[in-house]
């Protein structure tokens, strides 16, 4: 259930109740692809850095260790020892990124495992069964994420097929939730808007999927190489047709500025691998812009990564020490850097929520939307 607390223009402050707790929105979901954050960050650490929702990957967990294994271990929450909300994506993005290794038909997709090459079939029903076995709180509908750029005719055929797949997902999801031995009978389902970069397709598709009673709606297939302004234009185009009483999720986005601008356009949920991935390469976010800790100028720098940050890394270690760890290729460098960047993203959405509560979101947007895209 989604409760809209207040609005500032199109920006929304809300609360979304799940079987494993209430999520305060806007929210950034921390990406643990295989049930863990890359960089030796545990579920216990996620609590310390302010994570509300963990996101895991259906495709990867289906291949390894197998969703049947996770089910026998009591579901993903028990398996990874995380008692907060979990969202699982449908596996569609990963399957469709295997361009030369998959074949699409109405029933679903046949693809070759990136691990051992074995042929695997996944369709709407299979995706729902896997996610039911994982026991996540939010399951994502199985969709096709088309390549960018995509021909209009193919994008149209694809989003029509994705609509039919959503209907099948909904039927299978309802059936699975009613079974007596299901891992998480309160699991919710989000539908996904597609249509490439064609606004007319996006609007048509959003209107159609909104007729199917999902628990939330996502905008997918963006941040795949299109100009940032095109992404914003698509969000602006579909937002009027997204149900007001359901959460909105912008998939795979993005930079701190993208998140601020997404909130300004009515988005509630975000996820991205960027903070953890950048951290593993020494690229860290601060309230003054981003820095690259591997640069020579930090060799004798006694400051924390960010004077304004109170994450465990900034409370205890200097830029000079962290630079040394990176240069020495110590695993601790990855852990400390990832924890900082994820803390920063979680703090960013907390500060956005605080600004919305205070009626000061536009001032926050003006102060930080451009600044956070710059180098410090």
What are these regions (language model features)?
Residues 21, 54, 89, 131, ...:
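Conserved, mostly hydrophobic/aromatic
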Residues 148-151, 156, 216-222, 331-334:
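Glycine- and acidic
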Residues 1-17, 23-32, 39-40, 143-149, ...:
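C-terminal extensions of enzymes
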Residues 21, 162-169, 209, 238, ...:
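Hydrophobic alpha-helical packing residues
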Residues 135, 166, 170-173, 177, ...:
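Structural signal for hydrophobic packing residues in well-ordered secondary-structure cores
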Residues 1-183, 296-299:
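Non-catalytic, usually N-terminal nucleic-acid engagement modules in DNA/RNA processing proteins
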Residues 160-163, 172, 176, 184-305:
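Glycine-rich phosphate/ribose-binding loops and adjacent secondary-structure elements
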């Amino acid at each position: 259930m989604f409760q809209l607390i207040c609005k500032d223009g199109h920006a929304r402050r809300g609360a979304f109740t799940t079987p494993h707790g209430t999520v305060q929105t806007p929210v950034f979901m921390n990406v643990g692809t295989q049930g863990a954050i890359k960089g030796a960050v545990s579920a216990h650490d996620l609590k310390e850095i302010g994570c509300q929702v963990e996101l895991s990957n259906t495709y990867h967990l289906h291949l390894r260790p197998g969703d049947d294994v996770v089910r026998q271990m009591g579901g993903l929450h028990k398996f990874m020892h995380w008692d907060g909300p979990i969202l699982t994506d449908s596996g569609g993005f990963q399957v469709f990124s295997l361009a030369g290794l998959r074949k699409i038909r109405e029933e679903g997709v046949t693809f070759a495992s990136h691990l051992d090459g074995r042929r695997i079939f996944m369709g709407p029903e299979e995706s729902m069964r896997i996610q039911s076995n994982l026991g996540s709180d939010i399951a994502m509908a199985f969709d096709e994420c088309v390549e960018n750029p995509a021909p209009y005719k193919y994008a149209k055929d694809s989003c029509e097929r994705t609509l039919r797949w959503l209907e099948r997902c909904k039927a299978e999801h309802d059936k699975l939730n009613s079974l007596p031995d299901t891992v998480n009978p309160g699991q919710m389902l989000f539908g996904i808007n597609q249509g490439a970069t064609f606004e007319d397709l996006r609007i048509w598709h959003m209107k159609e999927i909104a007729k199917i009673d999902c628990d939330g709606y996502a905008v997918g297939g963006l941040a795949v190489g299109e100009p940032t302004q095109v992404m914003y234009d698509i969000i602006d185009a579909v937002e009027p047709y997204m149900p007001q009483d359901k959460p909105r999720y912008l998939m795979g986005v993005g930079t701190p500025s993208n998140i601020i601008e997404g909130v300004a356009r009515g988005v509630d949920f975000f996820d991205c691998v960027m903070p953890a991935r950048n951290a593993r390469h020494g690229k860290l976010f601060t309230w003054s812009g981003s820095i690259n800790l591997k640069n020579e100028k930090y060799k004798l720098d006694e400051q924390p990564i960010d004077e304004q940050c109170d994450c465990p890394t900034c409370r205890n270690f200097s830029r000079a020490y962290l630079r040394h760890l990176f240069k020495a290729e110590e695993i601790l460098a990855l852990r400390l850097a990832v924890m900082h960047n994820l803390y920063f993203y979680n703090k960013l959405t907390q500060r956005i929520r605080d600004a919305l509560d205070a009626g000061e979101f536009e001032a926050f947007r003006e102060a930080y939307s451009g600044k956070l895209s710059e180098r410090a």
